[in-house]
A protein has these predicted regions:
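Aromatic-lined carbohydrate-binding/catalytic grooves of carbohydrate-active enzymes
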Residues: 49-183
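Beta-strand-rich recognition/accessory modules
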Residues: 1-46
């Protein structure tokens, strides 16, 4: 994406709190420091966040190639392990031969990966005692998506479509975009 904030002389801009750290040692040492520094924010969070669900996101098992078949195998391996949600990550929408990272935007379920639609996979997730979830990078449109070419609903900056590498961005102020994404 693209974001900037111009602060003129005499003006000020306040950012949200961020936690940064450095240390001598390894990754475990720095992680420990960050967890300790952030725990006061987590521990003092609202009541609704005290009991957060445990989520299994399948991305690091399918690497953007989820299918009904491989999700059923994963479900068999993780059943009874305390997960509340099973999230189907990227790739569920990609067309044959096109990488997921340039396919987002049209968001049509792949009939190759899910020949019976997502419904059958959702049913399998529920049968294993978990709630189904699905990943959307809702704001982006990849260069292989049909929506990439229809620039009338994409975000513009200085009169040009805002493009970052191989991605463009939906204009979330556009009622068409809200309707389109709601239906997806």
């Amino acid at each position: 994406g693209d974001w900037k904030k111009t602060v003129k002389p005499g003006e000020h801009f306040e950012t949200p709190t961020a936690i940064l750290s450095v240390c001598e040692g390894g990754i475990d040492d720095i992680c420990h420091r960050l967890v300790c520094a952030g725990s006061k924010y987590v521990d003092n969070g609202p009541e609704s966040e005290q009991e957060l669900p445990i989520i299994f996101n399948e991305y690091c098992t399918t690497w953007g190639n989820p299918s009904h078949e491989n999700i059923c195998k994963i479900l068999e391996n993780i059943k009874g392990r305390g997960f509340d949600y099973f999230v189907i990550d990227c790739g569920w929408f990609k067309e044959d031969g096109i990488p997921w990272d340039i396919s987002m935007g049209d968001y049509n379920v792949s009939s190759t990966l899910f020949p019976q639609g997502l419904e059958k996979t959702v049913e399998a997730i529920r049968e294993k005692g978990m709630k189904p979830g699905i990943w959307f990078e809702i704001e982006t449109v990849g260069s292989a998506a049909r929506a990439y070419q229809d620039t009338s609903h994409l975000l513009h900056k200085d009169g040009a479509v805002l493009t970052s590498y191989f991605r463009r961005f939906w204009d979330m102020r556009d009622p068409y975009v809200e309707d389109y994404l709601t239906k997806k």
